Amino acid sequence: MRQCMDMDNLHNRLKRVDGQIKAIDRMIEQDVPCEDIIIQINAAKTALHKIGHVVLEGHLNHCVKDGIEHGDAEKTIADFAKAVEYFSRL
């Protein structure tokens, strides 16, 4: 799995999301208006969705490609379909 992802990119994205979540927590403590908190929650959600997109793209470009070329194509496609289904629920 490591070879199909840009680990540094993913770690940096996750650190940013972590910072966003901590900022949301501080906003709640500071009694910031609800609308502003919702905006930040949406930003964190969007960032997580993008991380999922990056992971799914890496999975397709490496794991799925390798599974089709060197493994069981039917199982690989079925597993990828499940991954896409999970991603679509984000």
What do these predicted regions represent?
Residues M1-L90:
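Solvent-exposed interaction patches of small proteins and small membrane subunits
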